[in-house]
């Protein structure tokens, strides 16, 4: 190196000088045992730089005349026979189908590196039991030489490194020329792969002592034209197709990848270094479009018939060169270490993915007999060869940035497993060219964190999160459909298939068209909207069901209501029956009791009748004694003085018990005729209607006149005897007039004067005067005095009843007390008081009249003494009320003051004493 400014070069240079002796360290060749023997020179050269090396006596640190490509060439491979199956884990004696040199210039992803190494991520043993044990890795110096060579050409010499294509074997491998070998594969896909232009029969014939330098061999055998400038005529292709179908040559790794359905065209690991960032989207193409092209190309290559490869010699710019072409700065160890932190693979063991994918491939090969598909594929290849020189160099710049990115190394397992009855592809272990060393992968794997792969999680479709995130950003819905649909058993999947960046543009266009058609077929059909008639019918059905539901509900509710009403009616009938029965029983009992009572009543009635009959009989037997008694009771017992006023005389007549002519004048029956005439003259003058103003004056005067006509004369007096009393007409007239006068006097006596000029009557009651007034404070009934007035509440205090006591009779005076004129005075009366608040005042007379009056009263009248006492008490106070017309004149007097009045008077007396 010319300078050490780049830190990556420092890093690589230090690695180269760490272990210089490792370049000559002998190790077991991965190709040992292929043809039976291997020379010692080959044993020492293979683990170092491959089958083409510098002289063995030179040290690697100071001699590198013309290093071979650090990675696999593009079109032709060196060092392996057609039937060799070699891996880094060791050689196998299994035969493999013919494999072809690399024909594509597309970059190789990390998944393809793993596939070429035949290693499963996270496992240290081969996937199949027939694989031998793993051999040691190549020395680190060889890995460093590979990377050093890459940086040497790209940085130090500033050389536009390109891939070279050789039409002849390299020095020392002349015996591995093109040969025709028959296929021993049991699968159709390996028979479909054409024979290479030159093949290897083994590495045992390599001449280690060959003096031919690699530079001379390269100048001699390298092609003079680049792959871009190489033109294959359409006629030659057509002629070749007639005799032998043309097919681009494939490498052993591509054969295995095709068997695994992972790839269709292999890529070199060197081209992987030219990838750019993975998440950048190609301009004008959506993310995920490259994957569609890969899938289409995988289907195309898997169904294509064998085509004989065309060996082309390509020389870039007239000078061959051994280093690969890189369009961008390759990755350094720092970049790889930094990216490995973000793109870790899953640590789950791979459960033989190669066998499962070969099963899928064997089922997909059943479609190879379709002639239309074969013709379509061959036409595409002819168009590819025809337009190889006309490809626009800007197509490389339009490549999707996802393809230029370092693809994540993962171990994706196909979720769908085919039936066991399908014919599996033969087990083929991918052979790795000695130059295609796995040192790059080993370094990356050593830089990878173990915890990083352990915590990696896969998404639902089996991709790691980073790749899933890239494909989830697809702008086309069809991309998601193709990516997520894993249920199609006839679809061939490829996780790392890429279209060649320098390939035919028409192929890309065809692939895009086919992808669009696939997307169009897989697009879900738009759901047809119902018409207005369907909507109307559905609405009508909904309304009908709605109405029917409510109708059912109403019918159910009505039925329940009827049932409940019937139950209530039944309960009523039951209750009525019980009540009727109980009432009937009770009625019968009452009838029986009434009959018993009737019997007792009849008995008592008969008894009373008998008693009265006996009494009547006794009265008949004592007739004579009764007549004598009647003679003695005829007239007054003693002579009564004549009354001084008409009122007193009328009152005496109304209360007289013995009613005859002698009682009217107040004389005895044995009086003289002169006494009768004298009393007649005085009484006629006293009760004369012309002079008397009482209400019953006419009746009283008539009574006096009839009595005088009965006994005023001797002849009439002799006829008015006790024997003829019942047959005397004058006596009957006397009794009739007397009754009329009594009525008139009682009516006048019970009439109460009022200012309203209406007539108010007092009504006699059966209340005893001794227990007349009820007292609320004492809880007992006090006796009532003459003319006392009190009030009682009835009907829950709603009505008031006023009473007064006169002549030892309690009268109801409510009509007079509730009159409009009297209400103002009596409305404040308190009911059920202990003391009497008001008293009723009667008309007064003079002492002479009173004395004369008292003389005419009957001694048997109970109220005579009471009236006299009352009149004597009130004579002085109410002298102005004397001689009034009414019989029942009333006045008020506070007989007993109220309690508050007493307290007020006592306070006044105390105040006077203080003064």
From Swiss-Prot:
Asked if the record carries the keyword ATP-binding, the reply is no
Where are the compositionally biased (Polar residues) regions? 22-47, 494-505
TM stretches of this protein: none
Biased-composition ranges, Basic and acidic residues, are: 1-11, 289-299, 351-386
Among Pfam families, the record links this protein to: DnaJ, Jiv90
Q: Which gene encodes it?
A: dnj-5
Q: Which organism is it from?
A: Caenorhabditis elegans
Chain coiled-coil ranges: none
Q: Where is this region: Disordered?
A: 1-48, 122-142, 267-300, 338-399, 474-527
| Protein name as annotated | DnaJ homolog dnj-5
């Amino acid at each position: 190196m010319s300078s050490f400014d780049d830190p990556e070069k420092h890093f690589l240079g230090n690695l180269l000088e760490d272990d210089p002796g490792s370049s000559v360290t002998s190790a077991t060749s991965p190709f040992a045992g292929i043809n039976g023997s291997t020379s010692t020179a080959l044993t020492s050269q293979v683990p170092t730089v491959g089958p083409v090396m510098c002289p063995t006596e030179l040290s690697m640190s100071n001699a590198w005349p013309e290093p071979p490509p650090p990675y696999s060439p593009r079109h032709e491979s060196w060092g392996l026979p057609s039937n060799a199956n070699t891996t880094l884990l060791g050689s196998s004696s299994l035969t493999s189908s013919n494999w072809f040199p690399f024909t594509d210039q597309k970059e190789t992803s990390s998944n393809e590196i793993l596939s070429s190494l035949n290693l499963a991520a996270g496992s240290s043993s081969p996937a199949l039991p027939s694989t031998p044990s793993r051999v040691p890795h190549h020395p680190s110096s060889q890995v460093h030489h590979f990377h050093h060579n890459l940086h040497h050409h790209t940085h130090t010499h500033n050389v536009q490194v390109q891939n070279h294509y050789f039409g002849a074997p390299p020095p020392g491998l002349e015996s591995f020329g093109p040969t025709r070998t028959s296929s021993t594969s049991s699968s159709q896909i390996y028979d479909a792969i054409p024979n290479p232009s030159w093949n290897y029969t083994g590495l045992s014939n390599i001449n280690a002592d060959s003096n031919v330098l690699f530079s001379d061999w390269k100048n001699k055998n390298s092609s003079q034209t680049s792959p871009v400038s190489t033109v294959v005529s359409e006629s030659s292709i057509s002629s070749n197709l007639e005799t032998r179908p043309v097919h681009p040559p494939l490498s052993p790794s591509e054969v295995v990848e095709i068997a695994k359905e992972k790839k269709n065209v292999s890529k070199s690991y060197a081209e992987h270094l030219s990838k750019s960032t993975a998440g950048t989207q190609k301009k004008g193409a959506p993310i995920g479009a490259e994957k569609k092209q890969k899938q289409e190309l995988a289907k195309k290559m898997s169904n294509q018939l064998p085509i004989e490869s065309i060996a082309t010699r390509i020389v870039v710019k007239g000078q061959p060169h051994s280093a690969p072409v890189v369009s961008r700065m390759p990755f350094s160890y720092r970049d790889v270490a930094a990216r490995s932190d973000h793109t870790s693979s899953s640590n789950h063991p791979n459960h033989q993915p190669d066998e499962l994918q070969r099963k899928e491939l064997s089922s997909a090969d059943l479609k190879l007999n379709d002639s239309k598909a074969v013709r379509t594929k061959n036409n595409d290849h002819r168009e590819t060869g025809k337009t190889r020189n006309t490809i626009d160099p800007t197509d490389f710049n339009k490549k999707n940035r996802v393809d230029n990115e370092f693809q994540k190394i993962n171990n994706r397992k196909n979720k769908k497993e085919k039936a066991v009855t399908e014919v599996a592809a033969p087990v083929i272990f991918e052979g790795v060219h000695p130059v295609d060393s796995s040192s790059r992968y080993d370094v990356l794997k050593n830089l990878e964190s173990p915890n990083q792969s352990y915590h990696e999680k896969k998404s639902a479709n089996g991709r790691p999160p980073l790749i899933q995130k890239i494909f989830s950003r697809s702008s086309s819905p069809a991309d998601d459909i193709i990516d997520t649909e894993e249920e199609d058993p006839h679809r061939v999947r490829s996780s790392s298939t890429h279209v060649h960046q320098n390939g035919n543009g028409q192929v890309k266009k065809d692939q895009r068209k086919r992808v669009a058609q696939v997307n169009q077929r897989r697009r879900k059909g738009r759901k047809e909207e119902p018409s207005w008639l369907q909507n109307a019918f559905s609405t009508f059905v909904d309304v009908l069901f709605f109405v029917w539901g409510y109708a059912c509900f109403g019918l159910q509710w009505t039925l329940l209501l009827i049932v409940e009403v019937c139950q209530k009616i039944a309960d009523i009938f039951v209750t009525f029956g019980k009540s009727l029965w109980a009432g009937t029983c009770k009625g019968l009992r009452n009838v029986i009791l009434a009959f018993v009572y009737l019997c007792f009543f009849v008995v008592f009635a008969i008894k009373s009748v008998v008693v009265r009959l006996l009494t009547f009989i006794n009265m008949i037997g004592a007739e004579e004694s009764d007549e004598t008694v009647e003679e003695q009771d005829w007239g007054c017992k003693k002579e009564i003085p004549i009354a001084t006023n008409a009122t007193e005389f009328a009152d005496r007549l109304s209360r007289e018990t013995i009613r005859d002519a002698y009682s009217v004048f107040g004389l005895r029956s044995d009086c003289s005729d002169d006494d009768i005439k004298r009393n007649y003259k005085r009484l006629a003058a006293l009760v004369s209607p012309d002079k008397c103003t009482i209400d019953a004056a006419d009746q009283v005067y008539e009574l006096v006149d009839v009595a005088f006509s009965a006994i005023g004369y001797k002849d009439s007096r002799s006829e008015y005897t006790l024997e003829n009393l019942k047959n005397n007409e004058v006596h009957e007239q006397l009794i009739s007039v007397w009754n009329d006068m009594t009525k008139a006097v009682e009516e006048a006596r019970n009439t109460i004067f009022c200012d309203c000029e209406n007539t108010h009557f007092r009504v006699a009651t059966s209340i005893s005067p001794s227990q007349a007034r009820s007292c609320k404070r004492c809880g007992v009934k006090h006796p009532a005095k003459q003319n006392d007035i009190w009030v009682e509440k009835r009907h829950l205090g709603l009505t008031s009843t006023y009473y007064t006591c006169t002549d030892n009779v309690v009268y109801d005076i409510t009509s007079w007390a509730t009159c409009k004129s009297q209400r103002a005075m009596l409305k404040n009366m308190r009911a059920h008081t202990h003391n009497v608040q008001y008293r009723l005042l009667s008309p007064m007379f003079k002492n002479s009249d009173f004395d004369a009056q008292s003389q005419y009263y009957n001694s048997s009248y109970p109220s005579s003494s009471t009236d006299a006492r009352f009149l004597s008490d009130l004579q002085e106070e109410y002298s102005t009320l004397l001689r009034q017309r009414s019989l029942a004149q009333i006045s008020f007097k506070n007989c007993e003051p109220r309690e508050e009045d007493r307290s007020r008077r006592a306070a006044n007396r105390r105040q006077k004493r203080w003064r």
